[in-house]
Amino acid sequence: MNIFDELKARGLVFQTTDEAALSKALTEDMVSYYVGYDPTADSLHLGNLVLILTMKRLQMAGHKPYALVGGATGLIGDPSFKDSERSLQTKDTVTKWSGKIRSQLERFLDFENGENKAEMTNNYNWFENLTFIDFLRDVGKHFTVNYMISKDSVKSRMESGISYTEFAYQIMQGYDFYELNQLHNVTLQLGGSDQWGNMTAGTELLRRKANKQGHVITIPLITDSTGKKFGKSEGNAIWLDADKTSPYEMYQFWLNVDDADAVKMLKIFTFLSLEEIAEIEEQFEAARHERLAQKVLAREVVSLVHGKAAYEQAVKTSEILFGGGDLRQLDAKSILTGLKAAPQHQVTDDEDLTLVELLISAGIAPSKRQAREDITNGAIYINGERVQALDYVITDSDKIENRLTVIRRGKKKNFVLTY
């Protein structure tokens, strides 16, 4: 199976230009290709990861990747299918975010070895000294207004209004393709399905200005079985930066993927072969309650993004938090991350309460009678250890890093005491 057929088998091809010619090129030649990343945040996220891994698949097949950071286009903002104008970022912010994108991409792409080693460039390099007059004469003249407003990404904004700044974005992205072709013989662009209009502006400019054929592959919007955009947890993006989304949070995200989506996501987000995935699917369907596909997803993706050690720590954290282990084996940060949704109670320095009084003060038990019953019945745990003494008082040894204590009532209800 050639790389193009594999991408299709994994559900990673939505639209292409001239599929036969593209498949032939990917089979016979080393193709130079690129993906653009506008620095619109200080970290890439799970949606970006689909494209990053697709870049890696092509590199592993012998093709040469170029990661284009949108130092110039990031100052403008892509209007594609957005309801309103993006906020413009300062040049300093865009420069700072561009640097972070590179460091994240280096985890996945090989920038060091071989003829097809990855390279990174920034479109600010060619836009910085391009005058407005030159841009209109050398680039703008190749695009008719009719062509530009026919793009679905622009049509969706015609009623609400679109500034000339954002309207011109597709020409800027098209010019990126032209420049990369002239500088590095790049002939293929990858992007999300919402980028089709901007990307084909590039193939059009390449045809008109250089009489060359360029290719485009768009990757489908990744959705779950209900049709919702995949890659968010409770409305929040899953970031690749561990300071924004911890390895533990990413691990839990993958563990909680719906059964209907798990095998699909294995094809998209892992480098397991399709044969291996078929075997996992067979075992998974035979015993869905064991959640094998989700466990493999969590292992593969967290290890890929954050490393094996971070994955193993996430497993350990999960087992201790939800398996009844000794929480003192974990650091305070891991506990607070894992129990983010648990109620918290600030204990003041002058509180020296018995466990019964503390359960009431923290809202864990509604009354002294209920608190005593919970303790004597063995339903109260401090940092994972059962406590049945009614006169028990929290001591420094119960304070993890002198910052917190976890009280569990029953099997699952956790409360965090902070100091």
Swiss-Prot record:
**Chain span(s) of sequence motif 'KMSKS' region:** 229-233
Q: Where in the cell is it found?
A: Cytoplasm
> Which residues does the annotation say bind L-tyrosine?
Y34, Y169, Q173
**Stored Pfam families:** SYY_C-terminal (PF22421), tRNA-synt_1b (PF00579)
Name the PROSITE patterns for this protein: AA_TRNA_LIGASE_I, S4
- Reaction(s) this enzyme catalyzes, per UniProt: tRNA(Tyr) + L-tyrosine + ATP = L-tyrosyl-tRNA(Tyr) + AMP + diphosphate + H(+)
Motif 'HIGH' region positions after renumbering to this chain: 39-48
Q: Where does it primarily localize?
A: cytoplasm
Enzyme Commission (EC) number: 6.1.1.1
GO BP, sorted A to Z:
tyrosyl-tRNA aminoacylation
Record's NCBIfam families?
tyrS
HAMAP family, from UniProt? Tyr_tRNA_synth_type1
What the record says about family reads: Belongs to the class-I aminoacyl-tRNA synthetase family. TyrS type 1 subfamily.
Put simply, this protein is called: Tyrosine--tRNA ligase
